[in-house]
């Protein structure tokens, strides 16, 4: 699993926190950030440079001939697919944690309200005697 990341020397893909991708001249720059350890000020990161793929395509206009376009390297595309799987999984786990915490807060509120209601009913019973 994550063969493309492993081919970059990333032995433990589960340590990946996020990534960024930018274009510089004729290259795409991929920067992968790892989870910070306790006491670290900055997250550890690695940077990779991919040359952009050049293609010659037919121009849109009549009689225009051909034009050269640049696009992302196929290898980089595969790496990004794997990174998206990892980063999306992390977001899903965070969203699930947030949902569970919200559910707990709601349950706490409902139980507190019900306890107050029962105590009020008990108070009414003791006043009527």
Swiss-Prot record:
It comes from Enterobacter sp. (strain 638). Pfam families: DUF3461. Belongs to the UPF0325 family. InterPro entries: UPF0325. This is UPF0325 protein Ent638_0703.
